[in-house]
Swiss-Prot record:
This is Glucosamine-6-phosphate deaminase. Catalyzes the reversible isomerization-deamination of glucosamine 6-phosphate (GlcN6P) to form fructose 6-phosphate (Fru6P) and ammonium ion. Its EC number is 3.5.99.6. One of its GO terms (biological process) is glucosamine catabolic process. Keywords: Allosteric enzyme, Carbohydrate metabolism, Hydrolase. NCBIfam families: nagB. One of its GO terms (molecular function) is identical protein binding. Pathway: Amino-sugar metabolism; N-acetylneuraminate degradation; D-fructose 6-phosphate from N-acetylneuraminate: step 5/5. PANTHER family: GLUCOSAMINE-6-PHOSPHATE ISOMERASE. The gene is nagB. The lineage of its organism: Bacteria, Pseudomonadati, Pseudomonadota, Gammaproteobacteria, Pasteurellales. Coiled coil: none annotated. Homohexamer.
Length: 264
């Protein structure tokens, strides 16, 4: 695992955006060989999307030959609902870049047969061979995507019941009314994420410190699904200083020294 400790959330966003752009450009995608990018929603990646838009507007990257797969979607919210992840992605990112709409893949939370929808999504990912880079965030309880605590670490795309902690955390998007938050979501599995060639996780804020500790210093544990990244061959975790508060001082120092050596 590569841990990149930075000073603040703004630096995390800029670093992640530059990393993604460099990966896309190095890949030299074409219509026949697209770069496949996994994407999250939520507050943590929002600034990264803004930075990616800036880099696109500056002519440093094109998304014309990029195919995206989003992590998750609420069950029961139509795409036009302002709190659906369809709406979030188009409003905050896709509408501002040159990605063809047919290259965008987001789970259908309105599907009549959600199991079939999840199987279709997995098959679509397989049709491209693999996801080259999957960006994600982490919940305060260590969940990635909607793989809540005690999720199988080999799980695939499926429907999940959201925990009370997640409902409370997401209620800020629903008039602070936990009863308005959908109780179910479709989500890629931990196994789906682990199949990606590379995983890039953004961790910011004091409230994510325990999750980061579980990810970096804890044992692999299904109660902290983020800990599965320890088994990934190419996992990159980018964090700000507040998120490192529960890590040992020597752990942070170790990874900072590694980054200094990489920069030389």
């Amino acid at each position: 695992m590569r841990l990149v400790p930075l000073d603040c959330a703004e630096q995390v966003s800029r670093w992640a955006a530059r990393y993604i752009v460099d990966k896309i450009n190095a890949f030299q995608p074409t219509a026949e060989k697209p770069f496949v990018l996994g994407l999250p929603t939520g507050g943590t990646p929002l600034q990264t999307y803004k930075e990616l838009i800036k880099l696109y507007q500056a002519g440093e990257v094109s998304f014309k030959h990029v195919v995206t797969f989003n992590m998750d979607e609420y069950v029961g919210l139509p795409p036009e609902h302002k709190e659906s992840y369809h709406y979030f992605m188009f409003h905050n990112f896709f509408n501002h870049i040159d990605i063809p709409v047919e290259n965008v893949n987001i789970l259908n939370g309105m599907a009549e047969d959600v199991d079939a929808e999840c199987e279709r999504y997995e098959a679509k990912i397989r049709s491209y061979g693999k996801i080259h880079l999957f960006m994600g965030g982490v919940g305060v309880d260590g969940h990635i995507a909607f793989n809540e605590p005690a999720s199988s670490l080999s799980s695939r795309t499926r429907i999940k019941t959201l925990t009370e902690d997640t409902l409370i955390a997401n209620s800020r998007f629903f008039d602070n009314d936990v009863n308005k938050v959908p109780k179910f979501a479709l989500t890629v599995g931990v196994g789906t994420l682990m199949d990606a060639e590379e995983v890039l996780i953004l961790v910011t804020g004091y409230n994510k410190a325990l999750a980061l500790q579980a990810c970096v210093e804890g044992a692999v544990n299904h109660l902290w699904t983020i800990s599965a990244l320890q088994l990934h061959r190419r996992a990159v975790v980018v964090c700000d200083e507040p998120a490192t508060q529960e890590l040992k001082v020597k752990t942070v120092k170790y990874f900072k020294q590694l980054e200094q050596n990489i920069a030389r």
